[in-house]
UniProtKB/Swiss-Prot annotation:
Organism of origin: Bos taurus
SMART domains referenced in this protein's UniProt entry, alphabetically: KRAB (SM00349), ZnF_C2H2 (SM00355)
Taxonomy of the source species: Eukaryota, Metazoa, Chordata, Craniata, Vertebrata
Keywords in alphabetical order: DNA-binding, Metal-binding, Nucleus, Repeat, Transcription, Transcription regulation, Zinc, Zinc-finger
Protein name from the UniProt record: Zinc finger protein 2
Subcellular location: Nucleus
KRAB domain residues: 14-85
Disulfide bond positions: none
Compositionally biased intervals (Basic and acidic residues): 103-116
Region (Disordered): 97-124
């Protein structure tokens, strides 16, 4: 019986056909078991090609996997080019020796990056997948048709109980505090630090602690003075590229992050996240003194100063101290000169735009801040906050003379005037 000639595929198979490279973001979403499975499948695919007995050079991704490196920075040098893009070339050079690499790694080559150079064409070997296995042009197995090489997903599907989320990337890691979901457990752990306040990364220079390693890395640059990313519009320099990108949107006016509820747009995602808590009512930052919760960590920090009585922001003109830097800035404008922002309705002038905006609500009747207990509405958030103390019974302001507590700062001041009249300090 005559041997049946194999039906030739139109395109020969290269390692690129059976290889998958993740982006940085995709790689971070994989848990360790998924990464190990990926590496195992990639190495098996490569060994299948090498098992033909031909000196096929090892792509950079294989060198990285064998050394235990993460493969997401890999680009397949040698698979892009003119003549060598479709076939595996045997014209190869020895890869520079890597300290600590095995003899097997040192002996494997890397593809010539300049595939379009002049000179005689290099010998090539065409590799095909025939009847589910790899073969060369010299072989003549009795098969009816060539098959495409199995993809990574197909390889994983035929392995023993592959993790389903490796293929679908489901968000199955849920925070028990707020219900937010994540792709992997490590992202969930990092998120939960916003609830616990845990900051495991300490700066060796000043002792300041951070909840994320990346935040510590950016902070360390403040000690070295390194600011490698400079804005070409204004010359301002930044510690990291992401901060520069956000800053440049000030010049371009781009606001790519839009609220799905009200349509308001923002320069960065974190500002959008903070804004959306207005709609959801989420307040993940809780005061450990009184239990009051806030939508932003900065607001919690300012609130906690009430309990300590510390006012870290002091005016260098008159010495008056404030809880927040914004209050200090508004105060300092009083020293700077005439108020710049004037109400078109009554002519009253203010030192900053936010104060004018708050004032204009008196004329418009706008009261966007409503009490969830009784439904009473207010034009300013601070007035709603004071009102809510009627329901909660909270009295955060304490007299330093007698220890009596009050629900508002103005009540403390009025109370202390009695001591001033009596000459009591």
């Amino acid at each position: 019986m005559a041997a049946v000639s194999p039906t030739r595929c139109q395109d020969p198979v290269t390692f690129e056909d059976v290889a998958v490279v993740f982006t940085d973001e995709e790689w971070r979403r994989l848990v360790p078991t998924q990464r190990d499975l990926y590496k195992e499948v990639m190495l098996e695919n490569y060994k299948s090609i090498v098992s033909l007995g031909l000196p096929v050079p090892g792509p950079d991704v294989i060198f990285q996997l064998k050394r235990g490196d993460e493969p997401w920075l890999v680009e397949f040098h040698g698979f892009e080019g003119k003549e060598g893009a479709e076939n595996v070339s045997l014209d190869w050079e020895t890869k520079p020796e890597i300290q600590g690499a095995s003899e097997e790694e040192k002996s494997e080559g890397s593809l010539k990056e300049n595939l379009g150079r002049k000179g005689p064409p290099s010998p090539k070997v065409e590799v095909y997948v025939l009847d589910g296995r790899l073969g060369t042009e010299k072989e003549s197995p009795t098969v009816e048709a060539c098959k495409k090489p199995p993809s990574l997903e197909e390889s994983l599907r035929h392995r023993a109980t592959p993790p389903k989320k490796f293929l679908t990337k489901e968000r199955d890691q849920e925070c028990s505090n707020c219900g937010k979901t994540f792709f992997d457990h490590s992202s969930l752990i990092r998120h939960q630090r916003t609830h616990t306040g845990e900051k495991p990364y300490d700066c060796p220079e000043c002792g300041k602690a951070f909840s994320h390693r990346s935040s510590l890395s950016r902070h360390l640059m403040s000690h070295t003075g390194e600011s490698p990313y400079e804005c070409n519009a204004c010359g301002k320099a930044f510690f990291d590229r992401s901060s520069l990108t956000v800053h440049q949107r000030i010049h371009t006016g781009e606001k790519p992050f839009k609220c799905s509820e009200c349509g308001k747009a923002f320069f960065d995602r974190s500002s959008l996240t903070r804004h959306q808590r207005i709609h959801t009512g989420e307040s993940p930052y809780e005061c450990n003194q009184c239990g009051k919760a806030f939508s932003q960590k900065s607001i919690l920090t300012r609130h906690q100063l009430i309990h300590t009585g510390r006012k870290p922001y002091e005016c260098n003109e008159c010495g008056k101290a404030f809880y927040g830097v914004s209050s200090l800035n508004r105060h300092q404008k009083a020293h700077a000169g005439e108020p710049r922002y004037q109400c078109s309705e009554c002519g009253k002038a203010f030192f900053d735009r936010s104060s004018l905006t708050q004032h204009q609500k008196i004329h418009t009747g706008d009261k966007p801040y409503e009490c969830s207990e009784c439904g009473k509405a207010f034009s300013q958030r601070c007035r709603l906050t004071r009102h809510q103390r009627v329901h909660t019974g909270e009295k955060p302001f304490e007299c330093s003379v007698c220890g009596k507590v009050f629900s508002s700062k103005s009540s403390v001041i009025q109370h202390q005037r009695r001591y001033a009249k009596q000459g009591i300090d």
